[in-house]
Regions:
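Flexible, low-complexity linker and terminal segments
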Residues: 65, 70-297
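Glycine- and acidic
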Residues: 48-55, 192-196
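Short, functionally important structural connectors and interaction interfaces within domains
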Residues: 30-33, 46, 180, 274
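Short, conserved catalytic or adaptor-binding loops enriched in Gly and charged residues
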Residues: 40-47, 265-266
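Thiamine diphosphate
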Residues: 1-43, 52-73
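Short, basic, glycine/proline-bearing loop/turn elements
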Residues: 51-57, 219-224
Length: 297
């Protein structure tokens, strides 16, 4: 998968990768759950290129985020990860019928008319936003050329230093527009609280319920939950998380992977990591007991 991911990054081919996480390495715990592949999704394959990571919190969210993933992949010509896990896949939910009227499809291809008006077609044309015109092979009289080696605007191999800089910067410029399309994290509960729990992906339900149970007992907690993981809206995330009380990052992995992304992408350091990596999903009771053991509440 990592090799194919790099090929998509270099050829600027849209790709959506559904990554269903479970405990590894190797066969690991094949029927149990974990959130252990986040940093793999962020860094997999050789070299640097733009990518996007989304993590649905519910089946409803999975449906609509998948639609968004395909749109972003087509628009920015990048790989997009959808991070699920065994817990989200196996849990039974009752939800409203999906509203397909919200769905629009745009492959973001160059039109036949635009191609006919071009004297020459450059698949990797240098553009201000980094997005080059994408045509399908056979769509017009123009030749579509792609190569996994570094290439010039026409798609032919070019390994000169000047060309490498031009193409690398062109690809990375996509991150600016992509970041604008990311949604800020959801804040659940009171805006101001003594303790802020931070979660991502499928852990939303158990954390939400733990917040409700503790607030009913007179505690003061809220939840900041992420479904749009990367790229991150740095300033918006900082505005939400700075000057909070005690911050606790709740994750199903052994190393606090999302907390590391918060540090590198938003320069936010959490106070406490609440981690579970025994293959079982979070429950409200587990979260509450862990908060008590860590003397957070």
């Amino acid at each position: 998968m990592a090799e194919a991911l790099g090929l998509a990054g270099m050829t600027e081919t849209p790709a959506v990768i559904f990554l269903g996480q479970r405990p590894g390495p190797a066969t690991g715990l094949p029927t149990m759950t974990e959130q252990g592949d986040l940093l793999f999704a962020l860094h997999a394959s050789q070299g640097e290129f733009p990518r996007c990571i989304l993590a649905p919190k519910t089946p409803d969210d999975a449906f609509y985020l998948t639609v968004k993933a395909f749109d972003l992949a087509d628009k920015y010509q990048i790989p997009v990860f959808i991070m699920s896990d065994q817990y989200l896949a196996d849990t039974q939910f009752t939800c409203e019928r999906f509203d397909t009227s919200k769905i629009t499809t745009d492959r973001h291809l160059v039109s036949d008319g635009e191609l006919e008006s071009m004297d020459a077609y450059k698949r990797y044309s240098i553009t201000p936003d980094g997005i080059s015109p994408r045509a399908l092979p056979g769509q017009s009289k123009h030749l579509v050329v792609a190569d996994s080696d570094e290439h010039n605007e026409e798609g032919h191999i070019d390994q000169t230093a000047d060309n490498r800089i031009l193409m690398m910067e062109k690809r990375m410029r996509k991150l600016k527009g992509l970041t604008m399309e990311m949604e800020s994290p959801e804040v659940y509960g009171p805006r101001e609280a003594d303790v802020t729990l931070i979660g991502w992906g499928s852990s939303y339900g158990p954390i939400e319920e733990a917040v409700d149970l503790l607030n009913e007992e007179g505690q003061s907690l809220n939840l900041v939950h992420f479904t749009h993981i990367f790229p991150m809206k740095r300033e918006e995330v900082r505005n939400i998380l700075l000057n909070k009380g005690t911050t606790v990052c709740v994750e199903s992995n052994a190393t606090g992977q999302f907390a590391k992304i918060l540090k590198t992408e938003a320069d936010i350091s959490v106070d406490v990591n609440l981690l579970r990596y025994d293959g079982m999903p979070f429950t409200p009771g587990y979260i509450i007991r862990a908060l008590q053991e860590k003397k957070v509440i």
